């Protein structure tokens, strides 16, 4: 029997005005919900600009507990529109202990679960190790009223192991709130290589696991607060891929965009029958994957 889910993705730019950002997010969530979305996914750290371009201890003031003000705000929205909502927040767990945390709300506004980002980058303009402690909740799918969601965050999307563990634990969708873009000195050729790699690796997770993938990114130029660089041009291109990696929808790399995409969830069963990758895995030969490097 065919089973479909309508997914809303909100590709939005950000300003320094928190109130305006939240109002705009509310409008965009409402827009896709009213267009029939049952599941709505936001981008990484969507409340504010991407503050990790610089190291500033004052920016820890942006973090908040979970539950807290933002979870209250998004809980009301999820309940009002009867949607499952995937959000991405800067979590204050304790003094000096902070996480980059995805929080999932069910259709009644309750917190269905959360995921703390496991892989933390530390690259020019992406100084996340300064702000975030690596996650300690494991790769656990979050059970919701529409299914089990394998939610990870941004840099996690480059690692096949997380996607595979989510799939082995019964995830029905792989979801990645994201903040990624180009540095101003990159050539056009390099920009296209980076974007192509980003899309390809996630479509590969869809193929390898026989699951749909949802990836939602920021868009637009965000200046570097320190003035040391020209900032990040977030490349958008939020997309939904089916269980064979086929692109079902993809947003622009230049503009804000809301999309509502229908996913046929019954296809995963058939694809896994045709391509039984899970059946044929030689799990007794994979012990070396637990090593940092094999010298």
Q: Where are the language model's segments positioned?
A:
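A short, polar/charged loop-to-alpha-helix boundary motif
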Residues: 117-131, 255-272
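Cysteine/selenocysteine-centered motifs that mediate thiol-based redox chemistry or coordinate metal-sulfur cofactors
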Residues: 139-169, 178, 268-295
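CN hydrolase (nitrilase-like) catalytic-core segments centered on the catalytic cysteine
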Residues: 63-86, 148, 154-258
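Short, glycine-anchored, charge-dense loop/turn motifs used at functional sites
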Residues: 7, 104-112, 239-248
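Residue-level detector of high-confidence beta-strand sites
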Residues: 101, 114, 250-252, 260
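Short beta-strand scaffold segments in enzyme catalytic cores
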Residues: 87-89, 101-104, 140, 238-240, ...
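Active-site-proximal beta-strand elements of phosphoester/diester hydrolases
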Residues: 4-14, 101, 114, 141, ...
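Cys-nucleophile CN-hydrolase/nitrilase-fold catalytic domain and related Cys-dependent amidase chemistry
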Residues: 18, 27-107, 112-114, 180-211
């Amino acid at each position: 029997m065919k089973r479909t889910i309508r997914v809303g993705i909100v590709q939005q730019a950000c300003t320094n005005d928190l109130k305006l950002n939240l109002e705009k997010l509310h409008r965009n969530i409402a827009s896709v919900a009213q267009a029939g979305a049952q599941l709505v996914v936001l981008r990484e750290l969507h409340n504010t600009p991407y503050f990790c371009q610089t190291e500033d201890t004052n920016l820890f003031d942006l973090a908040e507990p979970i539950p807290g003000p933002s979870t209250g705000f998004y809980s009301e929205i999820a309940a009002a529109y009867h949607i499952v909502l995937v959000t991405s927040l800067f979590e204050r767990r304790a003094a000096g202990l902070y996480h980059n945390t995805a929080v999932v709300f069910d259709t009644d506004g309750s917190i269905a679960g959360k995921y703390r980002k496991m892989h933390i980058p530390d690259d020019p303009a992406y100084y996340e190790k300064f702000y975030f402690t690596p996650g300690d909740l494991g790769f656990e799918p979050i059970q919701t009223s529409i299914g089990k969601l394998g939610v990870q965050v941004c840099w996690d999307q480059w690692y096949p192991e997380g996607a595979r563990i989510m799939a082995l634990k019964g995830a029905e969708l792989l979801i990645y709130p994201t903040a990624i873009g180009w540095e101003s000195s990159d050539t056009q050729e390099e920009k296209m290589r980076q974007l192509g790699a980003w899309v390809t690796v996630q479509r590969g997770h869809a193929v390898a696991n026989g699951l749909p993938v949802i990836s939602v990114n920021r868009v637009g130029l965000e200046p570097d607060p320190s003035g040391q660089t020209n900032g990040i041009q977030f490349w958008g291109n939020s997309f939904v891929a089916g269980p064979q990696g086929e692109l079902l929808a993809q947003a622009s790399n230049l503009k804000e965009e809301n999309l509502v995409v229908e996913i046929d969830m019954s296809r995963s069963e058939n694809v896994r029958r045709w391509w039984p990758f899970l059946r044929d895995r030689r799990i007794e030969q994979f012990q070396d994957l637990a090593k940092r490097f094999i010298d």
